[in-house]
Amino acid sequence: MSMSTSTELFAHHWAFAVFLLGAFGLCALMLLGAFFLGGRAKARAKHVPYESGIDSVGSARLRMSAKFYLVAMFFVIFDVEALFLYAWSVSIKESGWLGFIEASIFILVLLAGLFYLVRIGALNWTPSRSSRQVSKPSVVININNSHPQ
C-alpha cells in the first residue's frame, strides 16, 4: 500500500473511525462510571429477591404460556415476509418478470408452510388436547327463594 492510497483510505473513512472510537469510549466511560460511583451491598441478604418490603413468596421464575411464544412466532414470520416483499416491491421495475416469479415462489412457499402448520394444529390458540371438556351438572340446583306451600 503506497502512502497516497492509505491517505485516501483514511480520508474516506475517518468519520467512521471517529464514530467507532466515540462509541467504544462512551461504553467504557459508562461502565467505569457505574463501577466507581455505584453502591455496593455487603449484607448477607444481597441476593434475596425484594418484593415491596416483605419476604418473597414462591419462585421468581414464572412459566409463560405457549400463547406468548406463538404470538412471537407469528410476528417473526410475518415481519420477515413483509421485509422481503417490501424490498421486492421497491425494485419491481429492475427485477422484471424474473423477480415477479421469484417473489411468487417465495409467497407460495410461505403459504405452503402456513397451511401445513394450520393442518397439524401448531398454530391453534387452544389445542384440542389441552382444552377441558365441561360436562353438564347431573343435579339441577334450585336457587330461587320460593318456598313450597
Swiss-Prot record:
Question: Main localisation, per the record?
Answer: membrane
UniProt cross-references to InterPro entries, sorted A to Z: NAD(P)H_OxRDtase_bac/plastid, NADH_UbQ/plastoQ_OxRdtase_su3, NDAH_ubi_oxred_su3_sf
Keywords of the record, alphabetical order, are: Cell inner membrane, Cell membrane, Membrane, NAD, Quinone, Translocase, Transmembrane, Transmembrane helix, Transport, Ubiquinone
Q: Which GO terms describe its molecular function?
A: NADH dehydrogenase (ubiquinone) activity; NADH:ubiquinone reductase (non-electrogenic) activity; quinone binding
State the source organism's domain of life.
Bacteria
Q: What class of enzyme is it?
A: translocase
What are the GO cellular component annotations?
Answer: NADH dehydrogenase complex; plasma membrane
Which cellular compartments is it found in? Cell inner membrane
Q: How does it sit in the membrane?
A: Multi-pass membrane protein
The UniProt transmembrane annotation reads: 16-36, 68-88, 98-118
**Reaction it catalyzes:** a quinone + NADH + 5 H(+)(in) = a quinol + NAD(+) + 4 H(+)(out)
Q: What is its EC number?
A: 7.1.1.-
Q: Which family does it belong to?
A: Belongs to the complex I subunit 3 family.
Known partners and oligomeric status = NDH-1 is composed of 13 different subunits. Subunits NuoA, H, J, K, L, M, N constitute the membrane sector of the complex.
**Task performed by this protein:** NDH-1 shuttles electrons from NADH, via FMN and iron-sulfur (Fe-S) centers, to quinones in the respiratory chain. The immediate electron acceptor for the enzyme in this species is believed to be ubiquinone. Couples the redox reaction to proton translocation (for every two electrons transferred, four hydrogen ions are translocated across the cytoplasmic membrane), and thus conserves the redox energy in a proton gradient.
| HAMAP family found in the cross-reference section | NDH1_NuoA
Identification of the protein by name: NADH-quinone oxidoreductase subunit A
Q: Which organism is it from?
A: Photorhabdus laumondii subsp. laumondii (strain DSM 15139 / CIP 105565 / TT01) (Photorhabdus luminescens subsp. laumondii)
